[in-house]
Amino acid sequence: MHCPFCRHPDSRVVDSREADEGQAIRRRRSCPECGRRFTTVETAVLSVVKRSGVTEPFSREKVVRGVRRACQGRQVDNDALNLLAQQVEDAVRASGSAEIPSNEVGLAILGPLRDLDEVAYLRFASVYRSFSSAEDFAREIKELREHRESRDDA
């Protein structure tokens, strides 16, 4: 790690701690050349592999934008959308893979969205799963009802 002050090519780690609920490592470093201290934050890069094969960094904002479209006209606030995006990122990171297929991101969205707002869930699922008929909607509504009943019974 280069020193940001004198550009010396080496530094010594003085202290390491977890940050962002274990998603990052915060390190205090000391430069052997100039003696100044600085902090670095290290995170594992999470990449999404799209259907076309193109790889791009995971973006919580992209998750929020996609879910916000499904929530238009619904009583869902930004805090709830941000929490959902965090849950999706946590679920995707829990897979342990640095590269995750885009369809797995979509699957990770469906569960928290179903619990957040059923109408928004149906809208998102209809696009994500390419519903082509009223039967597709009816099947999904039936599954929603079964999920709600099993959740209420528990």
Curated annotation (Swiss-Prot):
Q: Name one GO molecular function term.
A: ATP binding
Keyword Iron-sulfur on entry: no
Identify the stretch annotated as signal peptide in this record.
none
| Keyword annotations | ATP-binding, DNA-binding, Metal-binding, Nucleotide-binding, Repressor, Transcription, Transcription regulation, Zinc, Zinc-finger
**Free-text comment on the cofactor:** Binds 1 zinc ion.
Annotated ATP-cone domain ranges read 46-136
- What's one GO BP annotation on this UniProt entry? negative regulation of DNA-templated transcription
| Cofactor(s) needed | Zn(2+)
Kindly give the Pfam families that the UniProt entry links to this protein.
Answer: ATP-cone, Zn_ribbon_NrdR
Q: Where are the zinc fingers (unnamed)?
A: 3-34
Functional description taken from the UniProt entry: Negatively regulates transcription of bacterial ribonucleotide reductase nrd genes and operons by binding to NrdR-boxes.
The entry's family comment says: Belongs to the NrdR family.
| Protein name, as recorded | Transcriptional repressor NrdR
Give the species this sequence originates from: Rhodococcus opacus (strain B4)
